[in-house]
């Protein structure tokens, strides 16, 4: 039988992500999948389902907890101890590879999973010595994955109330080089566009977006996610701003999102690949990101962001074109499968067709929108002279 070397574990933890904040996305994603299952099983109503993130900077402590299904005691060790052996389904669940839960091992001294399943009187806990794992990974000794997991993992059960149902991730003693993970505002700003949360109530065009989604029989998955008790929302604004005073970050509106427009992308068989909305403005100029965190077109699958606000810039005739827009592109086809870093889709026939159509629309429609707006303004300026 083949030996699985320790480098695999390194690739799935310390070598997996360039941005440490991704751990929040991974744990929120897992929580949302379990919320879907809890609602389906009748354990909880969707309105009551929540993901609670707690950040204690002074204690260098982070926890991510949901009130979804939890894990049965009988399934706990196999479900949490196995690597890349998830029973989640591609195209149904937001996460499906069974590797995301390990990401916290790279950023703390101790990682703890604790859970309880409704109807059981015992909770289960799994503790990972993350510091020891990293020491073993950097050692010249050729440890196997089994060697390392056997040395760093311990489990136990504890009494719990029969009606309790939850899953909790705790990251204890966050590494000093990862102090950004303890910045509550930074984390909230990151998750407000990455996580599957609702649009902020003040965004005037959200009803139009929901209506278009409903016309396609598409449900935008939204969940209650809180950071230290503060609910998260997608921070889309009705106006576009400049910063007039960099020191005090004073903002002044220079344009507005007057409406939103839509585009549906279908494959050669007439099946919906994806759809998008984008804000219509006067396209005065490239939107300054410092004053407008929602700038750029963002790709989403399961309402979780793929890549960042620059991911689709390469499909514009000129990359700066992306910075004239705000909007979202929702992947629909099950053939659009996020890669393990969730910064793009796997290479499939559907991805090729999606990108081909995206590029054509950006070239034929979006480029002309902002280019003609600019040409019209320049013409007007010349005539005033």
What are these regions (language model features)?
Residues 1-12:
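P-loop NTPase nucleotide-binding/switch module
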Residues 90-108:
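Glycine-rich phosphate-binding loop
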Residues 24-27, 75-82, 103-107, 186-190, ...:
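Alpha-helical scaffold elements adjacent to nucleotide-binding pockets in ATP/GTP-utilizing enzyme cores
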Residues 249-385:
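Charged regulatory segments coupled to nucleotide-binding catalytic modules in large multidomain enzymes
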Residues 17-53, 100-106:
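Conserved ATP-binding N-box helix of the HATPase_c
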Residues 110-114:
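Glycine-rich ATP-binding loops of the HATPase_c
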Residues 14, 51-52, 56-63, 169, ...:
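Alpha-helical oligomerization interfaces and scaffolds
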Residues 1-3, 38-94, 119-288, 294-295, ...:
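Interdomain "switch/hinge" adjacent to the Bergerat
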């Amino acid at each position: 039988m083949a030996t699985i070397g320790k480098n695999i574990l390194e690739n799935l933890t310390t070598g997996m992500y360039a941005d440490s904040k991704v751990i929040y996305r991974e744990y929120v994603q897992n929580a949302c999948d379990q919320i879907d299952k809890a609602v389906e099983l009748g354990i909880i109503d969707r309105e009551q389902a929540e993901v609670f993130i707690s950040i204690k900077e002074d204690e260098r402590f982070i926890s991510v907890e949901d009130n979804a299904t939890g894990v049965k005691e009988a399934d706990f060790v196999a479900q949490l101890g196995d690597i890349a052996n998830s029973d989640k389904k591609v195209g149904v669940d937001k996460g499906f590879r069974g590797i995301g839960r390990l990401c916290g091992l790279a950023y703390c001294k101790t990682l703890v999973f604790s859970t309880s399943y409704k109807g059981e009187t015992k909770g289960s806990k799994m503790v990972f010595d993350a510091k020891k794992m990293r020491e073993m990974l950097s050692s010249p000794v050729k440890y196997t994955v089994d060697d390392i997991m056997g040395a760093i993992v311990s489990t136990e059960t504890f009494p719990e109330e029969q009606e309790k149902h939850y899953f909790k991730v705790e990251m204890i003693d966050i590494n000093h080089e990862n102090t950004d993970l303890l910045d509550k505002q930074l984390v909230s700003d990151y998750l407000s566009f990455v996580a599957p949360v609702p649009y902020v109530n003040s965004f005037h065009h959200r009803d139009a977006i929901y209506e278009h989604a409903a016309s396609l029989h598409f449900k935008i998955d939204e969940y209650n996610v809180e950071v230290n008790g503060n609910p998260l929302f997608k921070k889309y604004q009705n106006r576009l701003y400049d910063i007039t005073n960099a020191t005090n970050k004073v903002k002044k509106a220079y344009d507005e999102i007057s409406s939103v427009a839509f585009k549906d992308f279908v494959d050669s068989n007439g099946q919906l690949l994806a759809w998008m909305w984008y804000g219509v403005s006067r396209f005065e100029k490239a939107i300054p990101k410092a004053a407008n965190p929602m700038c750029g077109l963002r790709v989403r699958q399961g309402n979780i962001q793929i890549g960042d606000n620059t991911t689709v810039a390469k499909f514009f005739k000129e990359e700066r074109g992306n910075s004239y827009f705000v909007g979202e592109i929702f992947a629909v086809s099950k053939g659009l499968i996020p890669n393990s870093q969730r910064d793009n889709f796997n290479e499939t026939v559907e991805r090729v067709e999606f990108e081909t159509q995206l590029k054509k629309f950006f070239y034929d429609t979006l480029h002309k929108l902002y280019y003609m707006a600019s040409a019209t303004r320049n013409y007007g300026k010349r005539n005033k002279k």
